[in-house]
Every structure is written in structure tokens, then in C-alpha cells.
From Swiss-Prot:
The gene is truA1. It comes from Clostridium tetani (strain Massachusetts / E88). InterPro entries: PsdUridine_synth_cat_dom_sf (IPR020103), PsdUridine_synth_TruA (IPR001406), PsdUridine_synth_TruA_a/b_dom (IPR020097), PsdUridine_synth_TruA_C (IPR020095), TruA/RsuA/RluB/E/F_N (IPR020094). The lineage of its organism: Bacteria, Bacillati, Bacillota, Clostridia, Eubacteriales. It is an enzyme of class 5 (isomerase). This is tRNA pseudouridine synthase A 1. Substrate binds at Y111. Coiled coil: none annotated. Formation of pseudouridine at positions 38, 39 and 40 in the anticodon stem and loop of transfer RNAs. HAMAP family: TruA. One of its GO terms (molecular function) is RNA binding. Belongs to the tRNA pseudouridine synthase TruA family. GO terms for biological process: tRNA pseudouridine synthesis. The active site is at D53. The keyword tRNA processing applies.
Length: 245
């Protein structure tokens, strides 16, 4: 049996996230499994590198699946390109080790949250960036981000309904950059809690607006109180950028 590794990108706007759910719920996984099953005549189960929430996008999402088919990789890529909707594209595919598992072999993930800080929202990036035109103190945001680097209990940076067994996570780096008014908050870590990156971005945005101070981020960490909904930025600004194995 073959084990095939795929790298894909998708616009998550109209989907209820990656993971397949009950019937008639639109998800990325369900779309891909449906097309692969039709192509191979098998009941294909796709293993994803992790869950992305409703409305979240991905630039380099990694998945794998097992099949007995003997189609070439080029044939399968062309088939997927033809039959998947325009907002999902499988960019690469290759035969890989039987032991490869897209989820369990992940060492770290990189997400980016984008904020359009220009005066007016953009017609062309409105689905991929959160618009906030209040003047931001980028230097203060960078100072605040330093408190989040390392291994911490991120209980204050997840939703009340999160049922994760452990809220300990390790963030390797947070890079904050600005290009033509688009603020990108890039976060790399060994794993993330429910809505964690969106809450981190929301907290850093509050620092940028000078509603709170950089040191308040450290206080939030130490308080270990689950975040209130006001800190959670909209899903559309979040994108899974890369996966490290």
C-alpha cells in the first residue's frame, strides 16, 4: 500500500474548518476525501497535520493518505486540480515512507495573523486580513511578544470552552513585520490551543493601541485565566503558513 504526502493551500472563508464533521457540513477534509475516493474507487481517509478552525486559511497544509491505486503522482495532481473547488489546491504530492504521519510527526507549526492597518479596508485582501486603522505602536508590540517566547502555561490564551488536557505550550519565536500597512504577526510553536494564535494577536494588538502595556502580557500569562472573547480576532486574518517535521 502506498502512503502519499500532499502539500495544499486553501481559502477557508466558506468552510467550517479542516476536520470532517457531520453530514452536510462543508469542510476541507471532506472535499478532498470525496475527490480522492472517486478517483481511486477506494474509501480514502486523509490525515491532516492538524485542525484549522472555520474561516482560517492555509498556505502549506500537509496531509497524507494511503491507497492501493497505481496512478502516477502527476495524474493524481491533475485530477485533484480538475475536480476540487477553486479555493482548494493540492500543490505537491509524493510517495513517502509508510511510517510518515502528517499529524504525529509534526515538530512545529508556523501561523501568521495579518492586520490591515491602512486607513481604508482593501477590496482585495478583506478576506485575508483583519482591518483596524488605529495607529499602532509596533515597537511596543514587539516588546510584548518577548514575554510569550519559551515554554509557558497558555491558559490565559485559549477559549473558555477549550478542553485540552494540558495548556503548556512552547513558542519558539514571534516575528512582527509591517509592509505597506499590513502588519504580520508570525508565530512558531510546537502546538497551539483553541484560538490561541488569534488571542495572542488580539492581545498584541491591544498593546499596539496602547490600551495595555507590554508588561501586561506577562501578567496575563501568570494569571492563567481563560481569555475573554473580546481578545479573539476574526478567523479571516489567520493563516497556517508552514509545518516543520
Amino acid at each position: 500500500m502506498r502512503n502519499l504526502k500532499m502539500i495544499l493551500e486553501y481559502d477557508g472563508t466558506r468552510y467550517k474548518g479542516w476536520q470532517k464533521q457531520k453530514k452536510d457540513v462543508l469542510t476541507i477534509q471532506d472535499k478532498i476525501e470525496t475527490v480522492l475516493s472517486k478517483m481511486t474507487g477506494e474509501d480514502i481517509q486523509v490525515i491532516g497535520c492538524g485542525r484549522t478552525d472555520a474561516g482560517v486559511h492555509a498556505e502549506n497544509y500537509v496531509a497524507n493518505f494511503h491507497t492501493n491505486c497505481d496512478f502516477t503522482v502527476d495524474y493524481m495532481l491533475d485530477y485533484l486540480y480538475e475536480f476540487l473547488p477553486e479555493d482548494i489546491v493540492v500543490k505537491t504530492m509524493k510517495d513517502t515512507s509508510e511510517r510518515f504521519h502528517a499529524r504525529y510527526n509534526v515538530k512545529s507549526k508556523t501561523y501568521v495573523y495579518r492586520i490591515n492597518n491602512n486607513k481604508f479596508r482593501s477590496v482585495f485582501n478583506k478576506k485575508y486580513a483583519y482591518h483596524d486603522n488605529e495607529k499602532l505602536n509596533i515597537s511596543a508590540m514587539k516588546d510584548a511578544a518577548e514575554f510569550l517566547i519559551g515554554t509557558h502555561d497558555f491558559k490565559s490564551f485559549t477559549r473558555l470552552k477549550s478542553n485540552s488536557k494540558s495548556t503548556i505550550r512552547a513558542i519558539k519565536y514571534i516575528n512582527i513585520t509591517e509592509n505597506q500597512g499590513i502588519i504580520s504577526i508570525e508565530v512558531n510553536g510546537n502546538g497551539f490551543l483553541l484560538n490561541m494564535v488569534r488571542i495572542v494577536a488580539g492581545a498584541l494588538l491591544e498593546v499596539g493601541k496602547e490600551n495595555i502595556k507590554p508588561i501586561d502580557i506577562e501578567k496575563m500569562l501568570n494569571e492563567k485565566k481563560r481569555a475573554d472573547a473580546s481578545l479573539i480576532l476574526p478567523a479571516k486574518g489567520l493563516c497556517l503558513k508552514d509545518i516543520q517535521y
